[in-house]
C-alpha cells in the first residue's frame, strides 16, 4: 500500500497512449513518420559519412557537426521505431525495462546535444574572434576531449533520476502513459507516491543543462556580433555571419521547444500542445538539421557532390567490369 492509500505494484509493462486524437489515421501516420525517419537517417548518415571521407571537412566545426548528426540518429531511433510498431499494433504496450531504457537514453542524448550545441557556439566564437590562435586552441586532441565531455556530460547526470523513476511504486499494471514515448512528466503521474521532490530535481537538472548551455551560446554569439560589426567591409561581415546562420537556426528550434517542455516546475500545459512540441523536437529538428547545414554550406554541398560522383563512378565501373567478364565467359 502506497502512502496515499493506493495499491502499488511492480509493473511489467505500460501502455503508450500514442496520438489518440489521430487513431483513425494510423496507416497514414505510419507512412508519414516512416518517411520522416528514413529521411532523417539518410540525411544524418550522409553528413557523418561526408565529414569522415572528405579531407576538406576535417576541421573542428565539421567534427562537431558529425557528432551532432550521430546524436540525432540515436535520439530519433530511441523513440520512432517503437512508435511505428504501435501504429500497426492493436496493443500499444511497452515493457517496464524498455520504458525506463527509453526514458534514460532520450534524456541522456538530449542533454548531450545541448552541451554540444553550446560547444559549437564557442567554436564559432573562437574561429571568428581569435583566428590566429584558433588552430592551437581547437586542435584535434582538444576537439576529441570536448566532444567526449559532451557525451559523458549527458550520460552521467541522467543516471540518478532514471534510477529514482525505476524504483517508484506504480499504481497498477498496464497503466497508460499519456504520451507516445516514456517521457518524465507522464511517467511520474502514474506513481503511487508523492513525486514532488523528483519533479523538482528533474526541473533543476533540466534548467542547469538547458540554461547554462543557452547562456554559453548567447554569450558566444553576442561576442561574435560585436566582432563582426567591427569588420569594415560588408562582404567580410556577410561571410562571417554566414558561417553562423545554420547553427543559429538549429539552436533556436531546439532550445525553444525544450524550454517549453522541461523548464517548468509543474510540467504544465495541455497534452496536445506538449505532444506537438515534442514532435518538433524529436522529428522535425533532426530532419531539418542535415538540410540546414548542407544547403547553406558550400563546402558541404561540394563534398556531397564529390562523394556522389565517386559512388556513381564506382557503381558504373563495377557494372562495366561485370559485363566484360560475362562476355568473356560466353566467348
Swiss-Prot record:
Gene3D superfamilies: Rhodopsin 7-helix transmembrane proteins. It is found in: Cell membrane. Residues 51-59, 121-147, 229-242, 296-331 are cytoplasmic. InterPro entries: GPCR_Rhodpsn, GPCR_Rhodpsn_7TM, Olfact_rcpt, Olfact_rcpt_6C-like. Disulfide bonds join 99-182. GO terms for molecular function: G protein-coupled receptor activity; olfactory receptor activity. The keyword Phosphoprotein does not apply. One of its GO terms (cellular component) is plasma membrane. It holds the Pfam family 7tm_4. Residues 1-29, 81-99, 169-207, 264-274 are extracellular. Keywords: Cell membrane, Disulfide bond, G-protein coupled receptor, Glycoprotein, Membrane, Olfaction, Receptor, Sensory transduction, Transducer, Transmembrane, Transmembrane helix. CDD domains: 7tmA_OR6C-like. The keyword Disulfide bond applies. It is a multi-pass membrane protein. The chain crosses the membrane at residues 30-50, 60-80, 100-120, 148-168, 208-228, 243-263, 275-295. It comes from the Eukaryota. Odorant receptor. Belongs to the G-protein coupled receptor 1 family. This is Olfactory receptor 6S1. The gene is OR6S1.
Amino acid at each position: 500500500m502506497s502512502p496515499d492509500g493506493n495499491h502499488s505494484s511492480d509493473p511489467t509493462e505500460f501502455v503508450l497512449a500514442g496520438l489518440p486524437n489521430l487513431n483513425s489515421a494510423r496507416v497514414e501516420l505510419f507512412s508519414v513518420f516512416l518517411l520522416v525517419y528514413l529521411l532523417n537517417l539518410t540525411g544524418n548518415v550522409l553528413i557523418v559519412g561526408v565529414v569522415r571521407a572528405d579531407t576538406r571537412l576535417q576541421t573542428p566545426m565539421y567534427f562537431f557537426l558529425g557528432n551532432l548528426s550521430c546524436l540525432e540518429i540515436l535520439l530519433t531511433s530511441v523513440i520512432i521505431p517503437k512508435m511505428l510498431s504501435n501504429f500497426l499494433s492493436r496493443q500499444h504496450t511497452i515493457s517496464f525495462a524498455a520504458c525506463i531504457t527509453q526514458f534514460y537514453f532520450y534524456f541522456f542524448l538530449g542533454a548531450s546535444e545541448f552541451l554540444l550545441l553550446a560547444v559549437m557556439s564557442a567554436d564559432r566564437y573562437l574561429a571568428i574572434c581569435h583566428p590566429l590562435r584558433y588552430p592551437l586552441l581547437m586542435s584535434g586532441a582538444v576537439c576529441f576531449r570536448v566532444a567526449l565531455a559532451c557525451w559523458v556530460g549527458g550520460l552521467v547526470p541522467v543516471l540518478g533520476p532514471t534510477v529514482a523513476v525505476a524504483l517508484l511504486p506504480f499504481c497498477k499494471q498496464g497503466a497508460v502513459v499519456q504520451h507516445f514515448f516514456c517521457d518524465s512528466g507522464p511517467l511520474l503521474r502514474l506513481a503511487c507516491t508523492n513525486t514532488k521532490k523528483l519533479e523538482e530535481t528533474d526541473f533543476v537538472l533540466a534548467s542547469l543543462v538547458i540554461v547554462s548551455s543557452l547562456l554559453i551560446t548567447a554569450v558566444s554569439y553576442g561576442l561574435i556580433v560585436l566582432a563582426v560589426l567591427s569588420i569594415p567591409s560588408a562582404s567580410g561581415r556577410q561571410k562571417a555571419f554566414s558561417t553562423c546562420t545554420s547553427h543559429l537556426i538549429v539552436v533556436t528550434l531546439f532550445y525553444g521547444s525544450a524550454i517549453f517542455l522541461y523548464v517548468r516546475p509543474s510540467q504544465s500545459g495541455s497534452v496536445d500542445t506538449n505532444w506537438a512540441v515534442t514532435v518538433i523536437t524529436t522529428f522535425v529538428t533532426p530532419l531539418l538539421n542535415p538540410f540546414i547545414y548542407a544547403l547553406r554550406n558550400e563546402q558541404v554541398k561540394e563534398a556531397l557532390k564529390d562523394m556522389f560522383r565517386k559512388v556513381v563512378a564506382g557503381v558504373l565501373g563495377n557494372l562495366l567490369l561485370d559485363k566484360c567478364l560475362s562476355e568473356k565467359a560466353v566467348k
